[in-house]
Regions:
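Macrodomain-like recognition of ADP-ribose-binding/processing modules
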Residues: 3-142
Length: 142
C-alpha cells in the first residue's frame, strides 16, 4: 500500500473536521433537527435539570449543556461564585472538552453562556472571564 492510501483515513478525518465554532441568535428544536452535524451549547446547571432559558433544548440529541450555575432555581445557593473558581473552571473545561470530542461543529448562543440566568459577570466575574476566553478560542477570536 502506498503512503497516501495508508494515510487516507487520517487525512480524510482531518479534511472533514468542522472548522471553528459559530454563533446563532436563538435555538429551537426545529433548528437543531435541521443541523444534525452541529452541537448546540446551552447554559446548564450542575444538577442538569430544568428547561428555562437556553435549557429549553436540553433533551435534544444535538444539545450539550455547559455548566454555569449550581442549580435551576433563584436562591443564593443556585449561583456560582469565584470562591469556587478552580472547581468552576474544571466543570467548564470538562463540558467544553466533551463537546469538542464529538467532532461536530460547535454552535454558541449569540448572547453567550453564563450571561443570562447564571449572572456570571456579576456573581463570578473571574469565572465569567475564563468562560468567555474559552468561547473566544472556539470562535477563533483570540
Amino acid at each position: 500500500m502506498n503512503p497516501i492510501d495508508a494515510a487516507w483515513p487520517t487525512l480524510k478525518g482531518i479534511f472533514n473536521q468542522p472548522r471553528g465554532a459559530i454563533t446563532m441568535p436563538w435555538y429551537s428544536e426545529e433548528l437543531l433537527d435541521q443541523h444534525p452535524d452541529k452541537l448546540f451549547l446551552f447554559g446548564d446547571n450542575e444538577m442538569r435539570r430544568g428547561r428555562g432559558g437556553q435549557a429549553a433544548i436540553r433533551h435534544h440529541p444535538h444539545a450539550h449543556g455547559i455548566r454555569t450555575k449550581a442549580a435551576p432555581h433563584w436562591g443564593d445557593s443556585a449561583f456560582w461564585s469565584d470562591d469556587n473558581y478552580d472547581e468552576n473552571v474544571r466543570m467548564i473545561d470538562e463540558d467544553l472538552d466533551a463537546a469538542l470530542d464529538t467532532g461536530k461543529q460547535i454552535v454558541i448562543p449569540e448572547s453567550g453562556l453564563g450571561t443570562g440566568r447564571a449572572r456570571l459577570s456579576d456573581l463570578a466575574p473571574q469565572t465569567h472571564e475564563y468562560l468567555q476566553s474559552r468561547l473566544q478560542e472556539l470562535l477563533g477570536d483570540e
